[in-house]
Amino acid sequence: MGNRRLAREHALQTLYYADTGKTQGKDINEYKEDFKDSLDAAGFEFCSGIIDGALEHQAELDKIISAYAKNWSLNRMSVVDRSILRMAAYEMLFSPENTPVAAVIDEAIELAKKFSTENSSRFINGLLDQIKKERKNGQN
């Protein structure tokens, strides 16, 4: 498994815990430290950047996701799907990494296939594709 994919998996787990409030008294930075040994320095920095960025921009990301999630409120989405969407939207719109958008979407789909329901990958793909099109048109 690639270092960035593993970093995204760890970021997803941390964002999941943050969203559900099941941090068991742990600070988000403590969760990040739990993953330090399984990633190289670049992977750990990438993982931390996604976590910090998605949390910092969460209100903006939620507005953007909500705008494209026709007939789906954020609260109606599974926590896993919501976390994947926040991560991917953050990477697409705010991350300084400049990861190609197609790669971000592909990784989000793979995370959904691994950690969510059968239909989640299609839902996530469709929503992120809409964000990509708007971004390309300069509207985000």
Curated annotation (Swiss-Prot):
Keyword Electron transport attached: no
UniProt KW Transcription regulation keyword: yes
GO MF term (any one): RNA binding
Highest taxon of the lineage: Bacteria
Alphabetic keyword roster: RNA-binding, Transcription, Transcription antitermination, Transcription regulation
GO terms of biological process kind: DNA-templated transcription termination; transcription antitermination
InterPro entries per record: NusB-like_sf (IPR035926), NusB_fam (IPR011605), NusB_RsmB_TIM44 (IPR006027)
Cellular component terms (Gene Ontology): cytosol
Family: Belongs to the NusB family.
Classification via NCBIfam families: nusB
Function: Involved in transcription antitermination. Required for transcription of ribosomal RNA (rRNA) genes. Binds specifically to the boxA antiterminator sequence of the ribosomal RNA (rrn) operons.
HAMAP family listed in its UniProt record: NusB
Record's protein name: Transcription antitermination protein NusB
Species for this entry: Elusimicrobium minutum (strain Pei191)
Upper classification of the organism: Bacteria, Pseudomonadati, Elusimicrobiota, Elusimicrobia, Elusimicrobiales
